């Protein structure tokens, strides 16, 4: 088993989907990080897990990674079936809302 940060390939194999209702407990412990749709989820996970502070700081400064806003939390609590792509980069759970289907 490798020590240190996971590789991009290893992280890509752990991307999954989950509904907000499953993710809510992670929010309560402060573990949810929202990744904007224009940032690759695996790249964000790699930057965080490898402690690339310069890159992660840039993402934070540009709003590409952030803690969920009160509005997002309110909306997701109202729709607990809201689907997300997720990636665990311990101690965080990185989430990207999946685009709703237009009907």
Identify the function of each model-found stretch.
Residues 1-50:
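N-terminal, charge-rich interaction modules
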Residues 43-76:
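Short, hydrophobic/π-rich interface segment
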Residues 7, 14-17, 53, 62, ...:
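Residue-identity detector for threonine
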Residues 37-39, 60-64, 91-93:
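Generic secondary-structure microfeatures
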Residues 3, 12, 36, 49-50, ...:
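Generic serine detector
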Residues 67-103:
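Short, compact, well-ordered microdomains
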Residues 23-25, 62, 79:
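Enriched - but not universal
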């Amino acid at each position: 088993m490798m020590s240190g940060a996971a590789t991009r390939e290893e992280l890509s194999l752990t991307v999954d989907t989950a509904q907000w209702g499953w993710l809510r407990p992670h929010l309560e412990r402060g573990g949810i990080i929202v990744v904007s749709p224009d940032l690759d989820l695996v790249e964000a996970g790699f930057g965080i897990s490898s402690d690339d502070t310069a890159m992660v700081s840039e993402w934070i400064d540009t709003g590409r990674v952030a803690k969920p806003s009160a509005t997002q939390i309110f909306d997701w609590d109202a729709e607990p079936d809201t689907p997300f792509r997720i990636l665990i980069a311990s101690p965080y759970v990185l989430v990207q809302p999946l685009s709703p289907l237009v009907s």
